[in-house]
Structure formats: C-alpha cells, structure tokens
Amino acid sequence: MNKQDVMKLQTCVLKVNVHCEGCKHKVKKQLQKIEGVYSVKADVEQGRVTVTGNIDPALLVKKLSKSGKHAEILGGGGGGGGGGGKGFPNLNGQFANLNMGGNNKPKGGKESNQVKGKAGGGGGGGQNHGHGQPMQLNPQQIQQMMMMKAAHGGGGGGQMKMPPMAAKDQKKSVKFADDEDDEFSEDDYDDEDFSEDDYDDDEFDDDEDDDDEMGHGHGHGGGGGNHMPPNKMMMPNKMMPQMGGHHGNGGGPKGPNEIMMMMNGFKGGGGGGKKGGGGGFEIPVQMKGMGEGKNGKDGKKGKGGEKGKKEGKENKGGGKTGKTDAKSGGGGLLGFFKKGKSGNGDEKKSAGKKDGHGGNKVKSHGGGGGVQHYDSGPKKGGGGTKGGGHGGLDIDELMKHSKGGGGGGNKGNHNHSAKGIGGGPMGPGGPMGPGGPMGQGGPMGMMGPGGPMSMMGPGGPMGPMGGQGGSYPAVQGLPMSGGGGYYPGPPQASQQMNQQQYMQMMMNQQQQQQQQQQAVAHGGYGGGHGGDMYHPMMYARPYPAVNYAHPPPMPPPHSDSYTHMFSDENPGSCSIM
C-alpha cells in the first residue's frame, strides 16, 4: 500500500450477528469482496466485526444485510461526508476539521448532539456522546488506528469525553441554530465539565446542587451545550474557568469584558454558570466590596445572592424562576452602593415565559450579591432572561429596556440580534457580546460601555466612571486609573490610545519648545537679549532675569576634530565618502 492509501484508511466497527466460526468466515468473505476493504477482523464473542479500508460503512451494512446478516454500525461512522452514519471522512478532511490549535472545536457540521452513540455531525465533528472515548487522529496514530479493535468514532475528530450525566438529558439539545456553530462553537467554552471539580472552589460548591441542577441545563438554549474536556489551553492566563457554559449558547465567554471578573468575581461560586442549574449564568456582581456576599452556595459564605439552594431548582418547573433570596447586606456593588436589603427585598417576579421567548426575570436584589442569573435554562429557544435588577440598586426601571439577555442570543439585548447573530459567547447576542448580559450595552454591561447599568463603562446611565475615557475598573490590586483595567475593549481602547498619544504629543511639543527656547536664549537671535522676549511655554525651564548675563553659549560641535579624524564614524575624514 502506498502512503496515500494509508491516509484514506478508515476503521469501522459493525455489530453483526456472528454466532460461530462458520458465520464469521462467511461475513469475512462477504466483506473482503467489497472493493476498498483492506482488512477484516471478526470477534465472535462480542459479535463485532472491525473493517479497515477506504469504504463507506453504509455499503458494508447493505452488503451484509443482502447476505442475510443484520449489521449495525457501532463506531467510526459519521464525521465526514455529511454526518449521520454516512461516508467516512477521509483523514485529510479530518485534519482540516480538527483545528489543530487545540480548541477541540470541530468545525463543519452542526455539532450533533445525538443521544445514542451513533456518531453524527459533519466534518469530523461527530460527537459520540454515548461512547465518550475521544480520539484525535494524528498522523502518528494512523497505524494504531488501523490496529484498534473498536475505534469508536474513527471519524469524529473532536469527540469529547463526557461526564456520565450528559447523555441523559441530551435529547433537549438537538435543536441548534446554524450560525452559532461556525464561529463560536459551543464546545469551546462550555463549562459542563466543571462538575468534575476541576475549577470549583470547593468551599462554595455543594455537589448535590451540581448533580441536581446540571443535566437540566445542557444546551437547552440556542445551541446546545456540547461538552468538551476541560481545555486548559483556552483559559486566559489560566486564571479563570470558562464562565458561562450553560446559558444556552454554551460557550462561556472569553474576552475583555469578563476578565475583570476573574480575580474577585469568582470568589463566588464555582466555575461559572455551573450551579445555575438549568443553564443559569450567574454573574457575581460584587467585586471589590465583596463583603460577605460571596455568592456562597448554601448561604455558606453569607447569603451572597444565592440563599440556600435555589428553590425550584432553577426553573425546572418552567415559569418558576429560581428564587435567589439575595438578602445579604454585605458588599455592595464594587463597594460603591452599599445597601443591605434592597427596597424590593426578595421580590422575585417569576416572569416565567413573560418575554415571549421564554426569558425569566430573576430580580435578585440585595446589596450583597445581586447574582444575576441569565437563565436560558431549560427553555428551548434559549430565550434571554429579562435582565432583572442587580444588587442593591433598584434599577428595575433601568433594566426594563434591556429585555432579552443574551441567553441564546435569540433576542440579544439592545442589538436585537435576532436568531443569534453572534449566538456564541462573545457574539452580539451572547452573554458577553455587545448585546449580551455582560457585553457592551447589555443589561449589566458590567464593564462594557453603554449598558443601562454599565458600572464602569463610559456612558452608561449609571456608570460611576461613565463618560469619556473611563476604562474598565481596576481589578483588585491594580490602579483604578483610566488604563488600569485589563484589556480595555475597543471603545475604551481608542479613547485610552487617544489620551496616551495626546500626552505623548504634548511631551514632544514641550521638548521642542524647550529646545527652541534654549536656542533662542543662548544667543540664537541677537546674541544677548533675544531670548528673553520669548516666554517659556508650559514647563520649559525658566530663564534668568533680564539684567543677568546669559550663560555661555553652547560649545561649537567638533571642537576637537582630531578625535574623530581617523574614526570610522567620521565621514568627513574620507574624501570618497
């Protein structure tokens, strides 16, 4: 076999009713006849036949059923060639789809959220949810792949390993919107894996909550939270777990707006969105004045916005939003607005399906925690939750016009990016995108410019640092000045840049003025008295009073010409130059 043939080989595992050596022999013979089959291995005990070659598994099944043997494709199918159980992708196609950057983001087909282990999904992206055996085909592994007995999902480039509970509720997530898959695939940032205690803060985490609430939230929103192994490469500076995952669009956001939350925000609670069962996306509001409101799980650490278990298990019952009795008086948003129990107390309007797209309105007031649950929990359209009020401030009115949190991106805030134009984590409608719950202009554009409550962004109605030049607030331990925040977003970036360049220009201008003035003062014009008429500009050094003698003029350049006469650097010494 030449190299190209090897590259085209696929392994397919068929479940065939093989009872004895005779059957086995017959099946082998049938399969060997098919063009493109390279080797056939039969396992009588398990009733499995492993076929290697450049063939279409559907063809194998067809041939076997003709000869009276019922066959099913177990693994290896799907992937290329359009999903389902059809056509093996050739490996080159897989390499294209594997996205070697380590994102585990199979591009190509819609991420198939099929519950059975039948690998679906196009372009090497079939995720065999049932068999959670990831298999990344590198060129070095091709030979091994040929030898493997049961290569589950030879085709699936990006099959993700899943915790056991993933498959049980997966049925709900078979709906997905096309546009989300390409750019922001939900696997990239899904944090379903945080139930594995990779990044949880153990003290705030109680596992019953996880177990009860996870599994209800898998990807019910716009695009189905597909699952991936904790992918540490994708974490900015490994500082924080992927935040969002479950809010419908999968994909915990990554980006300037949320990095602010890394240092403090995550004291509260567990790797992001994980506990917001039903795919809730909790944003710990407090950062600086963290007080006691640590968003603690069972109110263990002060009832920071989530008192005890969220009753209703995060709207398992649909319209009943999880009560987050945000009573805690501690903290206050960034220590700015301290208000123990907000006026509306625990007013939880269970606005169930009020928004028409199934958005819940969780008003968690309370200075202490104000955890906003962007629950696009079990609602299938990924409805955005109507941005409820946040801690301490009675901003219900402010929030009214930011309906439709970024949940599934289906009605992205402000941007109305209907149908999830950027349904992914950072797209216009996503949880962090320009219209999403925390993006620029989202209901709580926490750092983003222009949200109704954009705490820090320029121009928000309430932004304490609103207005020009206000950058993100400093993260704990950084200066709170204009450039203090991490990664200012583009709008601020431009202002910051302008400021800096402006400062730079001012400095240069001053230096030039200084030099000119010095030149003038040292006899530039009229020897003795020219300089005094030119008053120094901003910070130029003051000149002596008029009636004093001027300092001696600058010495002429190259007074000691011998030093340079034979130096390489003095072109004057050489007539040719």
From Swiss-Prot:
| Keyword Lipoprotein tagged | yes
Q: Give the protein's biological function.
A: Heavy-metal-binding protein.
Q: Which residues form the propeptide?
A: 575-577
Q: Which residues form the HMA domain?
A: 9-72
Q: Compositionally biased, Acidic residues: which spans?
A: 178-213
| Name used for this protein in its record | Heavy metal-associated isoprenylated plant protein 34
Q: Which organism is it from?
A: Arabidopsis thaliana
Q: Where is the composition biased (Basic and acidic residues)?
A: 168-177, 294-326, 344-358
List GO terms (cellular component aspect). plasmodesma
What's a single GO MF annotation on this record? metal ion binding
Compositional bias (Low complexity): 97-106, 227-244
